[in-house]
Amino acid sequence: MTVKEKLLKVKQKFKRGDSSSDVDSGPERDRDEDDSDNESRNTSKTSKSSKKSKSGKSTGTSEMTELSDDGGSDIELLPDDGKSFGKRKLQDTDKPCTWNVLVRIIEAKDVSTGSARVRTIFDGNSKMTRTVTHAIPKWRQNILYTIKNQPLEKLAAKVLTLRLVRPTALGESSVGEFSCYLSEVIHSPDRSVIAKWVALGFPGMDDEEPDDIAYENCGFLKVTLSVYRIDESPPTLIDDDGKEQIWSGAHLIDYTLKIRVFSVEQLIRQMINERKIKKKQRFYVMVQCGAHKTETTMESAFLDEDANIASVKFEQEIYLPIQWPTVISEIIFSLFDKKGRGKTCIGKATLPMKMIYEPGETGYLPTFGPAFLNVFDCERVTRFSIFSRKMRGSQQDGSRFVGRLFIAIDCVEYMEKANAQIMHLDHSPIMEAESICKNLEWYNCFCSMSGLNMINPQFASDPVCIMMSIGSFGSTSNEFRSCNSSTLPAEPNWDGCKYFTMPWGNLRPVAEVNAPWEVIEHRIEMSNVLMKMTNMLDTMIWEVRRIGNKAIDHVSSVGMEALECLEQQIDSASKYLGRINPVSSNALDRHILDYRKEKILKLREHFEKEAFSIDYSDGEVDAKLLRMLLKIRSMTLELAEDVQMTIPPVLIKMMSHGKLIGFAKIPISEIFQSDDEAQSGEWCGRTRAINIQWPTLVDQRNRKREHVAVLHAKMWFGRTDQLTKWKEHVQPADIRRFMEMYEVQTKGLALKWKDEADIYDGKWEKTNEVPLENGWNAVGHWIVMNTRHMFVPKLGQHTVHDKAFEIQKRTEDGTWKHFKYTDCYADELKPKDLDKHAKGWEVGSWAQDKFRNNGDEKGWVYSTNGVFFGSGVLTDREEKVHHNFRKRCIKRPRKHEGYNKELEDFEHFRTTMGNENWEYSPSKKEGPYHDLEDRTDRIRRRRYVREVENKDPDSEDPRFRVYEYQMQTGKWQLRCYIMWGNDLLPVVKNSSRAFVRISFAQYSKQTLLVDNSQNPIWNETVMFKSVLIAGGTRDIMKYPPVVSVEVVGECSNNEEANLGHFETKPNVICGNTDVRGTPQWFPLKFSNGRTRGAVLACFELYSEEDKDLIPLEPKCKHNYKERSEIPTEFRPQFDKFHVQFLCWGVRNLKKHKLLAVRRPFVGLTIGDQEFTLQPLKDVRRDPNFPEPMIVFGEVILPSALELSPPLIINLFDARAFNRQPLVGSCLVSDLHKYVSHIVPKVKSDHAERWEQLDLVITEEFDQIIRMVRVPTLTTDPMVPLDWWSRYYASMSQFHRSPGYPESGMEYVRIFRRPLEQMNGYNNFSDFLDTFPFVKSMKGDFDDPEEKEKAGELKCRLLISKLKKGKPPAAINTVVDFVGPTRCLVRVYIIEANGLISNARKGRVDSYVKLHCGKQNVNLKKNYRSECCDPIFGERVDMTVTIPLEKDLKITVMGKRRILSDQEIGSTTIDLENRLLTKWRATGGLSGQFTVQGELQWRDQMTPMEILKSYCYKMMLSVPKIESRQTERGEEKGITIEKITFWFSEVLHVFENEEIAMLNSQRQKAGKENFSDGSDQQNEDVSDGSWDEEDLEREKEKLKWEKHRSKGKPLKKVTTEKAETADGELRKKAKMRIMGSQLQTIALFILRQMNLVPEHVESRPLFSDKGGRTQKGELRMFVDIFPMEYGAIPAPFNIAPRKPINYQLRIAVMDVRGAIPVKRSFAEPVSDLYVKAFINGMTKGHKTDTHFRVLDGTGEFNWRFLLNFDYNPWEKKVVAYTKNRFFCKPVEELVDPILVIELWDKNKFRKDRLLGDIELDLLDFIEGIGSPSDVGVYSTKKRQRGVKCPKCCTRRGCLCKCCIFCFETKCLCGKRKVKKKPFPKPVLFVEPEGYDDTVNIFESRNLYGWWPMLTEEYPHEEPQNAKKKNDDVGKDPKWIMGLVEMDMLLLTKQEADQEPAGKKRSEPNHSPFLEKPDRKSWANSWLVSRIKPCIKYFWHYYGLQILLWLIIIVILILTIFVLLHTWPTILAEIIKAIF
């Protein structure tokens, strides 16, 4: 049976269980659960077999109840609801990655094995856990699999198997197993299944076994499964989350994916080989969905000669199996061409799976179409087929359209077929699909190209052309190229710097494609409406990114504006979706609409939640706002996506010499024209910059430039009846069409041009006629327009225009009326002057001049005073209330009547040209052509064009070229203000030079080369003067041309290095009221979306028509006359700042050029000032600078610090020969972070008050010394209080800390994160910040982790703005320690949780290694064996010198036997920050000043001394001592900063804080809170408390309490008082152990100042191998004791609790009433022995065997000596398991249970367990005084000799007696008796007083009889079955015998003093054991069988044996006599004869 079929059976099982459980009624189910008693008891036996249920119920409820029952457990296993399963879509599942599969085995339940381990099998690898030998096996062990370079969709198809096995002598035997696909884990929330139970099925199933075997359950296994990437952290491993649920792994559902392949349409002509059409060239489609592949049948193509395309009809249906939810990322359709025996893939189409389904309860299954898929292939770029095939195989986005695949996808029920199937379609779906194909509409697509610049110099001398196509329409290739959809090939022009540009001017080429497409406008419009939100967010995200350097005000304004706009757009989109009525749509359209409506509501909720959670005053508001905007953008982008927008994208190809050199794809939706502007595409009719990418991936990876060129184009796509809107977008330009003719001449042998010329048309075909068809008319005459003619003033038309200005004035009623006309010189024109015209001209009417539109939409320019001409004119383009005059330009057409019509004749026009206007080329007819003749030229040509117009709208001719004619061309001036850069990508080591290159229109310029390429300062203005830009002024203002900026670095070999680029649009200025630009930061972008660095710049575009608008040119740079400075008005406003820099010292310096850095020094540069410190003498002795304070009194910086250059800190090393190499550098860009507005405090001098306080402190200290100390607070000597009691009590685990709440001692704070990340400590950087030095070499882009660090600088930066009369802020330099400080560092390692190892068997033999400076401490000897959650309990003392040894690194290692030890994870602590911080992190402050007991105050200073030191350092007022009289006597108080704290108030706050902390712990543990009448909560405690994750032992305690009670009601104990001793008891205890009132108040004040409390921190362990991933966490705390503070206090003893060694002596005397279960020689008989062991023992102790017991009485007199270790704190027994040689045993705490078993020994079969009893040593029943108390009576031995009844009762003859014996086969004449029956066991009934229980640790010595019980009736014979009227009750227990025992408990010391021998060995005492009173033959199995064997055979076969013996003796005697007498007889015979 396959694994898949096994999984199907398991799924059916859980489906049946789930459905039945849902049907059952609630009361019945509750009653069944309450009444049921668990038959599978929770024992500790190692060899007991599981009991099966005998209940006759068959409902699902009873089944699930039986499966979930655990002995004595109240936990109910419920099926996992799976509501979160498969609710999210998976991204990038097809990309290879390295994955970790984590399997955590927690425990097992209801398993029938003693010793067990779990073997995991995944991907062919097998790993296993350690072996445990407990009735409830617990491992808590992690197993990790690492799968490299594999996509998630392939990983999901693999099977994970968990197999529970029992180790045997020859291997292992399987108990049960669980298998699941990994996709079931992947689809779970966070790709993890946390602490769920899985059901173990019957192992070894095959096809021949019945199905019901699959439903048999073998137990449960609790596991955690997780799949995460190598760069992700594993989930939090919680072994008990309070929800006991069964995760069946059966969430996956099998479906069948139905794919209908109708046809391939619009197959391009290149794919058809005409020769093979006759041979029936065939095509087929291969469909790949995950691991399944299938192919359609081969079909022939049908060629349409008119349309020049082909189609292939398939009409087939493919069925593919699929599991749901799925991880398949896409369905791949490959189109193949069959050529003979070979086959070729000619194109592929991919369908993203995530876009055709939606997960979740409201989602839908995959569906698609019927719709088209566009098939693309990559262009052939090389002649070598091998390389071409390789490049095409790796190409992700093809550049050649192949065809359109018409398909439909649906999901149906599973067809129970594992393989794919193919069927032919019926007629009805074909007809439905054809109806969709026939619903077509004619669409037009236009692309008006205004420029193609930044062309790679590689193509400088090549003819370059642009072709456009949509699908198979347009110029698809060089062979199928049409004039109206391509440009004229031309040689690029040099742009004056580096790149090249196409010679396009006012006659812009336009590509046009007209084709029919299916009507999908409703999809495009809906997507565009939703895409508007994404586009708006993109703009806002770009604005936030380029604001730079923490400009909080600007960021806040942008953020609020973005949120307001987003809120409006969400409302609009919601209303729009509500209005949509899906009329003509398929199933996917309807599903997408419902999905969008649902998601838009969730988006609104998410927006409302996130929008109000941002604090705009936060310093990190930019990062938070950016994260929020990116998150919302991803949601809006997902909303807008629609896979059924199936019209092919616009394909723009850049060709040269017929080869593809670059391409770009433009989705139709971006340029779609709709009736509503909101539904139109973002770039519809707008000019945009399109990056032309390289044709292959090889080029994209290896080329230094990211793009081939940049195309500036205006694109439009819409219906044919919407062409008027396209013309509106083009205005004020016109669309013109031209027919073209070429006259070509060649040179002959004489090197002279031939007289004859060839005439070619636009398609380059020879012709003698003008190609003008019907429906087209020529306009104007012929003109010559060669390739390189950029600006064409005339097009051969005989029309000119007169221009004037119209001025209107506002009347009193607000209307506008005509005022006057003027000419261009402001002279007034009369109306009669406007009507005049010269003779010979035909004039038209005056109208608005759209070309000269500098105003609003109608061309008006407004003014207040009516002055529109001259200097100082103030005009505005928008109408306002105060405007009184307005002006616009008007024009009038004028035609010359003397137009020469002869020039319309082509031949005549040729003759008029002479020998001019030729363009030349060396060889090829296609060029490239140039204007000047060269001696190498062999071809020349003239290009004649003539405008044509279309009279018939239905006619078209692809031979006509289309142009956008801009009659208005103006001069413009671009000014680029390049200021400086920030944190650019380093070019090479030790930096270099950099410059900026700017490309605009047809030109490029660059700045000067400046030094320091990482933070360059250019301060230069780059001007582009008199740039001709064709187009109307308003169009340029609305859509300014794009400016491309590159930052380039200069390498040492004079090559250029790309430092990033960006594109922007300049501020267009055409009037005095236009707003000028402001400097902004522009982030530099790289490929793949990476960024690094920014440039501060500004760009302005001026119109040169009005010279007064253009500001004066800035002054020239010094020594560079051709370079200009930044104008004054653009320079940021500067202010004076006061900068303080506390340069404390350098740390962790790395080697530089293989030499250690010995004498480092630091150089600072901020603004225009520099400072250099003196080198250190020897960094190894003192790394701190002797004079660390650097003060810049006045530094001129920009007022807006976000525009400021960064603070540069360079680290140098002073070496021999005056060398000072640069070791590293650090850039501080975020100067806002270090600005301070706080006025410094003035240190007050109150010497007398400080002296008074010293006297009080001395008096308090003397009082403590005189105090009588109580060394211990322990009430129970057996359970002493220790540090672990405090630790467990602080986590609300009071069952592990008995007596601690009553002691009154304080609790400790448990932090769930590192200490420096808690309570606002901010990594303890309040005094010193850590600035990393980075080596000046080429680094990564955005990832600072990959930058190579050279060291660290400990410093403090403070910037304050200088204001008159106010002193600047100052750094508080008061610190306790200045130079190197000797300290004792005490590291307490508590425990580790969730360690993850890559070991094959998942074993972790962990230990701790510490490193600080040159000190290393290795605790390998104290490793913890095979434990993922080890308890270390280690304390390490290290004497270090801070800061020389400041980094403490704690590493958890994994011990290995042969290989080197493996590092699991490490964490690092900065000791210097903890020593110098104001939060006093040297040692945590205790919760109270405890001076009594085991855990006293452990600080070097008293609270009063600490308070004095803190107030002095923080410049606070001197604390004042107060006192007052109360009812309880004198009460002390302390006044500080005018606030008085009294002792009574402090006590009340302490109590509330303690209760709040415990409530927080209990809430996380799922318990009820304590109540003290106060609702006050401690926020810090709640935030920093540890999540309770170890509740299992507490649950076990409650479970065993119920088990011990045996069904009796538990004693009611007050939980609060039992666990916390809350109330007066604890208050009194606290008052006894606390110090004086002043010390308590001082401690309270210190804790209110947020000083570090006494704590245990949880530090994550990270491993750098294979990515920085978390490998667990470590609980620990560190104390730092400076030596100069005096004596070091005694340390805590945190060593793991040592158990107490005990010896339990059990004397087994007799056994009474043993029920035999076998027969021996027809008699019921038993071979008895007794076995005893304590839970956790690997081997039990047995007595000898009393053989052949007939009366149930066994004599033993045998002593057991059971040694065990007992943990009195947790009341557990320590179990030791050793699975490997040379390895420590594994310790585990188990319940203290003594098991006594009565066994029947079998010689040739397994021994049989008769009965047992489990005695909880803490609470078990006392022995029975007499066997008769339970109905067991001892009987006397019977006489075995029986006389014959016939002989004894009647006198008869011997003959009759013999005859009777012969008949009965009995010599004694006894009648034949029946077989003796088995004795009937006694039903166990509890005697009186049985409820009383005893504790062996209290009683110490016990004697009595204990029953051996069983729940199964021992015999199955009908005559021994219970009768119908027997009242046995529910769940009866039968007594199989009584064992007489004497138990004595001794400690190890007592046992050594009074030893006793095992068995009956000496010394034999307490009690003295004699030899058992049994027959000698009862000691051996063989001897005990001889006598009954003889008796048995004599009884049944004695007469036969006797008769046969007599006969044999007679025969022998006869033969003997004959032998002796034979000679005599023979002699007598002979004599008689003779």
UniProtKB/Swiss-Prot annotation:
Ranges of Acidic residues composition bias in the record: 66-79, 1577-1591
Localization annotation: Membrane
An example Gene Ontology CC term for this record: pseudopodium membrane
A GO MF label: calcium-dependent phospholipid binding
Extracellular topological domain residue ranges: 2020-2034
Transmembrane annotation, as ranges: 1999-2019
Membrane topology of the entry: Single-pass type II membrane protein
InterPro entries: C2_dom, C2_domain_sf, C2D_Ferlin, C2E_Ferlin, C2F_Ferlin, Ferlin, Ferlin_A-domain, Ferlin_B-domain
GO biological process: amoeboid sperm motility; membrane fusion; plasma membrane organization; plasma membrane repair; pseudopodium organization; spermatogenesis; T-tubule organization
Function as written in the Swiss-Prot or TrEMBL entry: Required for the fusion of the membranous organelles (MOs) with the plasma membrane, a process essential in spermiogenesis.
Full protein name: Sperm vesicle fusion protein fer-1
Origin species: Caenorhabditis elegans
